[in-house]
UniProtKB/Swiss-Prot annotation:
Protein name as annotated: Putative bifunctional polymyxin resistance protein ArnA
Species in which this protein is naturally found: Shigella boydii serotype 18 (strain CDC 3083-94 / BS512)
Binding locations of UDP-alpha-D-glucuronate: 259, 264, 298-299, 326, 358, 392-401, 479
Catalytic activities: UDP-alpha-D-glucuronate + NAD(+) = UDP-beta-L-threo-pentopyranos-4-ulose + CO2 + NADH; UDP-4-amino-4-deoxy-beta-L-arabinose + (6R)-10-formyltetrahydrofolate = UDP-4-deoxy-4-formamido-beta-L-arabinose + (6S)-5,6,7,8-tetrahydrofolate + H(+)
Keyword presence, NAD: yes
Length: 526
């Protein structure tokens, strides 16, 4: 036996079919019957030591947390099939699914999917008899339901009781609920993740974003937004402003960090001071004021782990010797992960750690940073193409990474902030795309192909070829590389109902297009 739920070896299994008409109570009876069968077969074998243990795939094992009322909201923008299955899952003996008409709560006890119903705004009443509600895809018929604490009745009777007519709108919360906007503090708001996350949050009407950074070029498009509040400054100087806003806000994302590999060997102490010491102070503010922190860990913490898939809960975190300063970023982040975890365990800090795996897209660094070598891979490669200099393949460019589109990454991060059912509390979540695995050499070739067919191609010099260079000559003697880095995204799927969707080629095309259109073409050949 092991202490974790749904972990350890399998000693007995029995498949239980879920029929289309099953609800929570009927499935419960099926599972009880199956459990009785298994115990009758297995307990004697355990007693006599005759069991055969089968190792399970730990990265596929799942468990679901305690049910909360949030699990029963009927969110009408979702597909009808999803809502129907939710009604089945939380029906008798549970309190069942619910929604509101104005301030009147009503419960749905049974439902039916109408996949080909006429299109209407999600949450709109399409018809009264049957009581048909438009969803994000298809429509849901409310077969039986209950108004408030009343009796269970047929859908058409429920519509009459609630005063519904064709075109009425349902909602997931009481209409009179005036919800204060959630205040989100983003330190490093002008950075790659910060500016894209700000855009996603401001797309909704229930977030107020407070940001600090040393520049504002990437967020200039938000500066006049009524729900965006920005101060230009350095986190090492503006400590009083930061403490005040940690106290004021609901969610804190300290995104400030030096995260470019060449800086790990070039300026290891600066990496430690900013990435560790400054962030530790912010973490302690969150503990002091009991604020939720969403902390950017990194895929770098896995280091030279040899697992096929890097798993948040099981993979070992392996780094090189002390005389390789390349690892100072990885261990700084790892120690902060452990500090946050300890504060959560011992002092009740509400936290989520997320680990990005090679996110890329528009506004990833800039070409000026790439000119001094202080940028991530794709931006450096684009600069080589723009300037007509050889693309440098460090140690042959055979290192493999899983590249993730910034839009996929931000959607996952947005869902962490939303934290439906508090499922993200105390979790470590990899955010990456295992399907987009490619070597740096392959990335370079895909980028080159996209560059050659770009409409602005004629403004730039001829391709200067690939050049293999040693990592020690490029990064310095304190560098070590990682051969592969592929995430398990089991936790992201379980906690966020998320999986990446965007193909790597699409990301490359859009990133290249963004940077080429930032280049001053007045001095370029035409």
């Amino acid at each position: 036996m092991v202490k974790r739920a749904d972990a350890g070896a399998i000693v007995a299994q029995l498949r239980v079919a879920i029929a289309p008409d099953d609800i929570a109570i009927t499935l419960h009876h099926k599972l009880c019957h199956a459990a009785r069968q298994l115990l009758e077969q297995t307990l004697p074998a355990i007693k006599h030591g005759n069991i055969l243990e089968i190792a399970q795939r730990e990265n596929e094992a799942t468990c679901f947390g305690r049910r909360t009322p949030d699990d029963s909201f009927l969110e009408w923008h979702k597909p009808a099939s999803v809502l129907h299955n939710m009604v089945r899952a939380v029906a008798d003996p549970w309190p069942s699914a619910f929604s509101y008409v104005g301030n009147q709560k009503f419960t749905v006890w049974s439902s039916r999917v109408h996949p080909h119903a006429s299109k209407a705004q999600p949450g709109s009443v399409i018809s009264i008899a049957p009581l048909l509600i438009a969803c994000g895809d298809g429509a849901l018929e409310i077969v039986t339901g209950q108004a408030g604490d009343g009796i269970t009745m047929q859908g058409s009777q429920l519509a009459q009781t609630l005063g519904l007519v064709q075109g009425s709108r349902l909602n997931s919360q009481p209409a009179c609920t005036a919800r204060r906007r959630t205040r989100v503090l983003i330190l490093g708001v002008n950075g790659f993740i910060g500016n894209h996350l700000t855009e996603r949050l401001l797309r909704e009407d229930h977030y107020e974003v407070y940001g600090l950074d040393i520049g504002s070029d990437a967020i200039s498009r938000f500066l006049n937004h009524p729900h965006f509040h920005f101060v230009e400054g350095d986190i090492s100087i503006h400590s009083e402003w930061i403490e005040y806003h940690v106290k004021k806000c609901d969610v804190v994302l300290p995104l400030v960090a030096i995260a470019t590999p060449i800086e790990y060997t070039r300026n290891p102490l600066r990496v430690f001071e900013l990435d560790f010491e400054e962030n530790l102070r912010i973490i302690r503010y969150c503990v002091k004021y009991r604020k939720r922190i969403i902390f950017p860990s990194t895929s770098e913490v896995y280091g030279m782990c040899s697992d096929k898939y890097f798993d948040e809960d099981h993979s070992n975190l392996i780094v090189g010797p002390v005389n390789k300063p390349r690892w100072i970023y990885s261990v700084s982040k790892q120690l902060l992960d452990r500090v946050i975890w300890a504060y959560g365990e011992k002092e009740g800090l509400q936290f989520t750690l997320f680990r990005p795996f090679n996110w890329m897209g528009p506004r990833l660094d800039n070409l000026n940073a790439a000119r001094i070598g202080s940028s991530r891979a794709i931006t450096q490669l684009i600069l080589n193409l723009v300037e007509g200099s050889p693309i440098k393949l460090i140690d042959g460019g055979k290192q493999k990474r899983c590249f993730t589109d910034i839009r996929d990454g931000i959607e996952a991060l947005y869902r962490i902030i939303e934290n439906a059912g508090n499922r993200c509390d105390g979790e470590i979540i990899n955010i990456g795309n295992p399907e987009n695995e490619a070597s740096i050499e392959e990335l370079g070739k895909m980028l080159l192909a996209s560059f050659e067919k770009h409409p602005l191609r004629h403004h730039f010099p001829p391709f200067a070829g690939f050049r293999v260079v040693e990592s020690s000559s490029y990064y310095g003697k304190g560098y070590q590389d990682v051969e592969h880095r592929k995430p398990s995204i089991r936790n992201a799927h379980r906690c966020l109902d998320w999986e990446p969707k965007i193909d790597m080629q699409e990301t490359i095309d859009e990133t290249l297009d963004f940077f080429l259109r930032t280049v001053d073409l007045t001095d370029k050949p035409s």
